[in-house]
Swiss-Prot record:
This is UDP-3-O-acylglucosamine N-acyltransferase. Its EC number is 2.3.1.191. The active site is at H241. It comes from the Bacteria. Gene3D superfamilies: 1.20.5.170, Hexapeptide repeat proteins, MurE/MurF, N-terminal domain.
Length: 341
């Protein structure tokens, strides 16, 4: 197991240090559980009372946190401890790669082009015309369809399916079970019979994109579905055909986006939200969890819908009242008219 000194970690993230710069840690743990061989951090002032009692070998803190620490504590001092934690977690990460070499059971078309240091796991299928950049990692059981291109340093965990002619940028991470480039939900109806419309567009994914487990991103009907750079999409999301998601947007688990939706840059979409298609959401919009967005959002801000959980008794009363809203509205208008007369 690797160990990391206070001096090394401070230099890595550009932080200042206090205490024994030779002290070493081998992992990261929560504030209340960290031991002498571990690093921990504080990102919320409400936890300051616990700093003095921490047994951690290294504490990552802000200037404002220092007075709450023991005089003997070894400190990494930074403006944003949570960002520092993220950077240190990457530096100390022990997660194995999805594959470490090219497995003998991988099926790789002779026309596929592989960059240097590519790894492909057992039983993966790489079809004709595929291009894999340097240091790409393809996990066991993945399927990469014809003429798909995947940029350098991108990693796919086991059992990811990438259909034909998809483009994926560099430094992306795609979790197990994701399906990218499957058919969009396109049909015409003729006297009750559904007629399938072939989806001849593609999916274009930018750089530094992360896609969660079992998320589906459908290919476009004619044009492409587009996911711009630095987008993060959680597990179990449905991104329909011709959706366009702007740079830096975050999409939490279980979100459903209908076809031809355009989501702006640096938006945050809360979990289990449902968003109508053929409309736009502006840059920097925040949608809270379980919202149903049926109309365009044109101004940055926080948007919500839905009824927060209540006791069953309270909810039944609320539901009953909603049935009477129309009657109450008519009575109110009648009273207003009577008063006006």
């Amino acid at each position: 197991m690797s160990v990391y000194s206070l001096k090394e970690l401070a230099e890595h993230i550009g932080a200042t240090s206090r205490g024994n710069t030779d002290v070493v840690v081998d992992s990261i743990a929560p504030l209340d559980k960290a031991q002498a061989n571990q690093l921990t951090f504080i990102s919320n002032a409400k936890f300051r009372p616990f700093l003095a009692q921490s047994q951690a070998g290294i504490l990552v803190v802000s200037e404002a946190d220092i007075e709450f620490c023991s005089a003997n504590s070894n400190l990494l001092i930074t403006k944003n401890p949570y960002v520092a934690y993220a950077l240190l977690a990457q530096y100390m990460d022990t997660t194995p790669k999805a594959a470490s070499d090219i497995a003998s059971t991988a099926v790789i078309a002779s026309s596929a082009k592989l960059g240097t240091n590519v790894s492909i796991g057992a039983n993966a299928v790489i079809e004709d015309g595929v291009e894999l950049g340097d240091n790409v990692v393809i996990g066991a059981g993945c399927f990469i369809g014809k003429n798909t291109k995947i940029g350098a340093n991108t990693q796919l965990w086991a059992n990811v399916s990438i259909y034909h002619e998809v483009q994926i940028g560099s430094d992306c991470l795609i979790q197990s079970g994701a399906v990218i480039g499957g058919d969009g939900f396109g049909y015409a109806n003729e006297r009750g019979q559904w007629i399938k419309i072939p989806q001849t567009g593609s999916v274009i994914i930018g750089n530094h994109v992360e896609i969660g487990a079992c998320t589906c991103i459908d290919r476009g009907a004619l044009d492409s579905t587009v996911i711009e750079d630095n987008v993060i999409i959680d597990n179990l999301c449905q991104i329909a055909h011709n959706v366009h998601i702007g740079t830096g947007t975050a999409v939490a688990g279980g979100v459903i986006m209908a076809g031809s939706l355009t989501v702006g840059r640096y938006c945050q979409i809360g979990g289990a939200s449902v968003i109508n298609g053929h409309m736009e959401i502006c840059d920097q919009a925040i949608v809270t969890g379980m919202s149903m967005i049926l109309r365009p959002i044109t101004e940055p801000g926080i948007y919500s819908s839905g009824i927060p959980a209540q006791t069953n008794k309270e909810w039944r009363k609320t539901a009953a009242l909603t049935l009477d809203i129309d009657k109450m509205n008519k009575r109110l208008k009648a009273l207003e008219k009577k008063l006006a007369d």
